Amino acid sequence: MLKYRLSIPFIAFSFMASCQSASITEEPLESVLQENLEAPPPTTGEDVFAPDYWDDAELVWSDEFDGTELSQENWKFETGNNGWGNNELQNYQNEGNVEVSNGTLKIIAKKENVDGSMYTSARLNSKKEFTFGKIEIRAKIPEDKGKGIWPALWMLGNNINSVGWPACGEIDIMEYVSYSPNEVHFTIHSTANNHVKGTQITSGPVPLETIEEEFHTYGVLWTDKYMKFYIDTEDNIKLNFLRPNISNSDNWPFSKPFYFLMNIAIGGNWGGLEGVDDSIFPAVMEVDYVRVYQK
């Protein structure tokens, strides 16, 4: 989910000429087969490529969404109906579109007119920021399979207000568009690699038949050498992005703090590509937890 969003994702292996390494896989990856772009091994400290590197990572922050209220210490609302750079149709509200109950957060998209918008939803930003770690979000996508919604779990660089998007960097931990059910997307954006240029790093559609019916864990293993995106278990890697051998702020803006975002967009350049089916509202994305583990 881009700050300023999106045409249909461009499959990662179709732009190998750009200065990064990425791969799409159904199996765990040990490396990416791009001879001149492979990230160099670390020269100091632990080997981040070691199979057991993450075994002793410790939980440093989480929100388990227990209780009946959203934590004001952890989250803040981002509101408005400016289209969000993607011609989205919702008006993000700070009340009425979020519920915490039975151990989960519910983000609720509704069909209702508010300030000239036909729909309302919620967009939550974390107040805390993180650099590197094992990131996990366990969530369930809205069950109705009609067209028009665009749920996302993602991160943005904390310098977005000074450098803008895409220079701040974006890490899409999970995106889903409801006109294409049973599929999920993982994507990375930077100045060098973004949808405007048609060079965003993406998994493309990853089949996941139970995405609308069951909770799944969407994770990222994030170091200063790579980002590996997975579903449910760390060995189920779906996108492996290595830091370019010749890296700079244009192609690797990912060695600084990022914050979380969770939202349901409605319509827009990607989510609304095939229109909006009003029968699917209210549409609810449930989040069981957000967890950050670090070494």
Residue ranges of each PLM-predicted region?
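C-terminal motif of bacterial Sec signal peptides marking the signal peptidase cleavage site
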Residues: 16-18
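Bacterial signal peptide processing site
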Residues: 20-22
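Bacterial N-terminal signal peptides that target proteins for export
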Residues: 1-8
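GH16 jelly-roll
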Residues: 24, 28-295
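Low-complexity, intrinsically disordered regions enriched in charged/polar residues
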Residues: 9-10, 182
